[in-house]
């Protein structure tokens, strides 16, 4: 089981990158990707709802090859972090993902900062481990406001940046806590790189691979 981190795209809803979970089983011969970033782009007022957190998102499943081809075609970086999990933990994580993708469970209330494709990664890992991850925040996070975090991926003079500023209001200048950095996939990537499991004190990531340099 591994975490896939995708680089930024060229439209607002892809500007911050993407996160997904890959499950590969050579015995049963499947290689699939679960991601929590499915939405109806054609819904009325999509971008305003996007930043205000008024959308329903879904978890979806796709073949890895199809997933890879899509993002390779968009010339977006794809980095894979293979997780250092036991067989029991891998089975538990896969079972969690299969439960989440059931029709009655797959829809969730999207929130720009607190409930998106990136935050779901840490949530799923900690649920599987039944314990919080251990990491040194000084190696991973800076003291930055939400505005600074957003503008690291958006041109501050763009309409997208302006629209997010307006939609998020005064909150945008608050300093983000460690957990509040994790709405951005790149910070989830950094968190996992520097994390250890609480019970065994071993690195969470066994191997990091650059699958598609952009």
Where are these regions (language model features)?
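Soluble extramembrane regions of membrane proteins in the secretory/endomembrane system
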Residues: 1-213
